A protein has these predicted regions:
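Anion-binding alpha/beta catalytic cores of soluble intermediary-metabolism enzymes, centered on
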Residues: 1-277, 281-341
Length: 341
């Protein structure tokens, strides 16, 4: 196990959480759940048909006897769930529509979290990212003061004598780009694009802290301190100002090119005196293209292990798996998700 996960395991053994898996009969989920239960790290709720879950577990020789299996089709609290969802949706969906949605494991699992049956949820082994995030937005909703849900990746690499190097990158998976939200009635800017990117920076820094990173946040661009114009330069520049206003204690700077953010010798030339440049460990991208490409370059060419996407801005921890995930990735994302609780 990578060093990153040892303290997470210790933390969770001392303060056990309950996690919901929305795809309870998937072999990868079952293997990870069996390991979590055997280690006594988490309490586990599997959503699905009990007979199917147990048959799939038996086929893989996975012991999930300590897990609770809940089938939406015969759950005693289902009617209460429907009533709660109708109230949450405030006329946007009928009782019949809510009933149909709650028969689906992604909505059902999310409602278990909303109603306090579990602390967190991990899905997406067979669902799309949208099918994991949509119920979360509708039922769990965003935290007070949050304007958007975002994501980050935690990446680490064994650097030999230098030890384990750990960094954070956001947003690499959720927000395609950042535009102003306009008030339809007045035509005025309700939420500036720069405020949204600043929020991503602040939330990514908070996530970084959870996993042992003392965040030094670089808001990235192809420009350093006005060396370039156009594109998203103004967005990155203004986001730094907004982030400093929103969290004066945050160590954040930009706009910075990546070399100025990480290389002290470059920072000395391009932005001397910066408290972040040359030593950044938390990187904020101006659009999803840059973020997604950036973390995958670090993963595939830089030798970093990447964990995520870790969702940010929700009232409860809900995370999304890649449909190409393996059991080890499910296990590790389970630890990460529970530690957000």
């Amino acid at each position: 196990m990578a060093d990153m996960f040892a303290p997470l395991v210790a933390q969770l053994k001392a303060n056990p959480k309950t996690i919901v898996f929305t795809e309870g009969n998937d072999p990868r989920i079952l293997e990870a759940a069996a390991k979590l239960l055997a280690e006594g790290v988490l309490k586990v709720v599997m959503v699905g048909n009990e007979a199917e879950c147990k048959a799939a577990a038996a086929a893989g020789n996975f012991d999930i006897s300590a897990a609770e299996i809940i089938d939406p089709e015969n759950y005693a609290g289902f009617d209460e769930m429907v009533n709660t969802m109708v109230e949450l949706r405030k006329g946007k969906q009928t009782p019949e529509e809510c009933t149909a949605l709650l028969k689906k494991s992604n909505y059902f699992g999310t409602m278990l979290v909303k109603m306090g049956k579990a602390d967190c949820l991990l899905g997406g082994a067979t669902y799309s990212t949208a099918d994991t995030i949509r119920p979360a937005l509708q039922l769990v909703k965003t935290k007070k003061g949050a304007h958007l849900v975002s994501s980050c990746f935690i990446l680490d690499r064994d650097c030999g004598e230098e030890g384990l190097k750990r960094i954070a990158m956001g947003d690499c998976a959720v927000n395609i780009d950042y535009t102003d939200t306009i008030d339809k009635a007045t035509g005025e800017v309700k939420i500036a694009a720069s405020a949204k990117l600043a929020e991503v920076a602040i939330e990514t820094a908070k996530t970084a802290k959870l996993f042992g990173i003392d965040p030094k946040v670089a808001v990235l661009s192809f420009s350093t301190k006005g060396s370039g114009k156009g594109g998203t330069v103004a967005l990155s520049h203004d986001a730094v100002i907004k982030a400093q206003e929103m969290d004066p204690e945050l160590a954040v700077d930009g706009e910075l090119q990546f070399d100025a953010a990480v290389a002290p010798e470059v920072a000395q030339v391009k932005c001397k005196g910066s408290k972040v440049a040359g030593q950044a460990n938390t990187f904020i991208f101006p659009c999803i293209e840059a973020g997604n490409i950036g973390y995958k370059i670090a993963q595939r060419l830089g030798g970093y292990a990447a964990y995520g996407p870790i969702l940010q801005g929700l009232n409860a921890p809900i995370n999304d798996l890649s449909r190409g995930c393996n059991a080890d990735e499910v296990y590790k994302m389970s630890l990460i998700t529970a530690c957000q609780s």
